[in-house]
Structures are given as C-alpha cells and as structure tokens.
Amino acid sequence: DVDNPFKKNRPPIKPRGGKKTQPVPPPQSHETIPRLDEIYIHCMIKQAIHNKQHLLSGLMALQCITSERPNVVYSKTGVANWKLRAGMPIGCVVNIKGPPMYTFVDKLVEIVLPRLKEWYGVPLSSGDGNGNIAMGFPSSALSLFPEVEGNYDSFPLMTGFDVIFNTTAYTDHEARALLSGFQIPFNEKKRKRRNIRVME
C-alpha cells in the first residue's frame, strides 16, 4: 500500500525464514551436465587437545590415502568443557582434485565401502541443498585403505573422518545421481509405522 504512512521511505519486508535464495539452474544441455569438482576430507582429533603429537597420526593417514599434503585445522572459539582454547590445533583437512580425486573415489568404492560393517549407505539428508554431499565414516574405515592397512603399526591412533563431495550440480538430486554413477550407495530410511489401537 503506497498510501500507508508506515511503509513510506522504508525498504520492503524480507520474506520469512533464514534460508537464502537458491540460484536458478541453467537450461539442461550437454554442457551443464553435473561433474565432480573437488573433495574435502577432514578429521577432528580430540586427543590433540591434551597432546599435539596425536595430530601426526591423522596427518600421516590423510596423506597416505590421498597422496596430498593435509593442512592443520585450528579452533576458532574456545570450549570450556573440553578445555579447548581458540587457536589450538584440533584436526586436519586435505583438498584433492583431478586424478588423485578419482583415485580416492575408486579406493573408497571398491575397497573400503564393501568391507564396512553395519553401513547401509549414505542417507538422503546428507546434502546441503546446493549440490554438495557430505558423509561421515568411523575410525574403522580409515584402517581399511590399503596404504594404512599395510602399515597399520605405524599409526598409533585411528580416527573417524568426513568426506565432502563438491559438485557442479545445482540440486542435491542431481548430485546424488552423479555420485550413484560412481557406485556410491544411498539409503532411504523409512519410518516405522506405529500400531495404533482404536478403543471400542
């Protein structure tokens, strides 16, 4: 309403909700086929809060399975319950692209995933809405890589790690279709129906 004095010289009200507007996907063509752009692998080592030497196991393990040199991750804020202060090293991260990226995916799909126990696939809710898929693995998965399994005694500490697949897809549906082409399974968790008894 233009005649409303309360709206005069004021910016329009933003839509409700904290979600940002998604970019408009381009028209479907052979040039806009989603592809795998890069992979981030990171792990957090809580034992490094008390002893920084525990970071060496994570750094060596990530370098062995990716053939790339990882970087140390430092905490941005402090947590009193964990005795963690800002600026302390707590983990490591590595970014891989190109041929090392596809080599890592091949080892993950062909060697690690078939040997994981009680792992039923990546949940469908693992996307961020922009075509990036994240998945977490326990510490037992790290020891299944051939580079780590052959030198298991050289790694005093095994830790879990997270893998983030960055794709050029605009939606999670396209990203899941892309990763399923790499034989990465997805699991749709079905809710159990509760038996409701009707009182007569």
Where are these regions (language model features)?
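An acidic, glycine-/histidine-flanked metal-binding catalytic module
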Residues: F155-E200
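Long, charge-patterned amphipathic alpha-helical coiled-coil/hairpin "stalk" segments used as oligomerization
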Residues: R69, N81-I164
